[in-house]
Amino acid sequence: AKFVASLIVIGIMLFVLGFLVMGFGLIAIGIPPTAEEFWRIVFFLITSIFYVAFWLNLAILFSLRFRQAATSALASVAVWLFFSVFYTMIVNLVAKGLSPSQMASPYQIISYQKFILGLMRLAPSELFNEATTTLLMPSVRSIGPLTMEQVQGAIPSPLPLGQSLLVVWPQLTGLIAATVICFAISYIMFMRREIRSR
């Protein structure tokens, strides 16, 4: 109940702020957004809610794990700082250490890039950035390395909304899965504590 109520309040705030920005933009520019642009913004706001839901669930998990409020708050901030700042630095060090030689084949280079990209996608912020960039920029056609065979024959035109959603579906699934996992762990810990107290 605490999670659902908090998420509803955050979702309402995000949608209100998003529509306020759209309204100010309409007043300043004078050009209304198209239907596809409007729905892109709506899906961007929904993605933002999923991202916030993950951190909210993680904060609830730490509040159940640690009895002191200050400790749980510091743990949440520490995890956020790690993934936002230090995780990228660690992945860059790994990338430099595992970088292929100049004589490597294109497929080895692509495999290396996919591996590093997979490490980066372990961070929720990276999943959120990839999803929002693809949703808000129709010119983004792929968020991973491509071979020359895949590039050849591609039409250089903006992707429709449906195709952009297909591109970012793995990122959205990852955010939802991480949120569900944190929620399940929090629920199990809460039920165990209730059973022991009785």
Predicted segments, located by residue:
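Short helix-to-coil transition segments within interhelical loops
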Residues: A1-K2
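Secretory targeting signals
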Residues: A5-R67
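Residue-level recognition of pore/gate-forming positions within transmembrane alpha-helices
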Residues: S6, I10, L14, V77-L81, ...
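Membrane-embedded alpha-helical segments of multi-pass transporters/permeases
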Residues: F15-L26, V85-M89, F183-I188
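Transmembrane helix-loop junctions in multipass membrane proteins, especially transporters and channels
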Residues: M22, L26-T34, L64-Q68, N92-P100, ...
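A structural motif at transmembrane helix-loop-helix junctions in multipass membrane proteins
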Residues: F44-Y87, N92, S101
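Terminal transmembrane helical anchor/hairpin motif
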Residues: L81, V85-L172, A184
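Junction motif at the cytosolic side of a transmembrane helix
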Residues: T173-R198
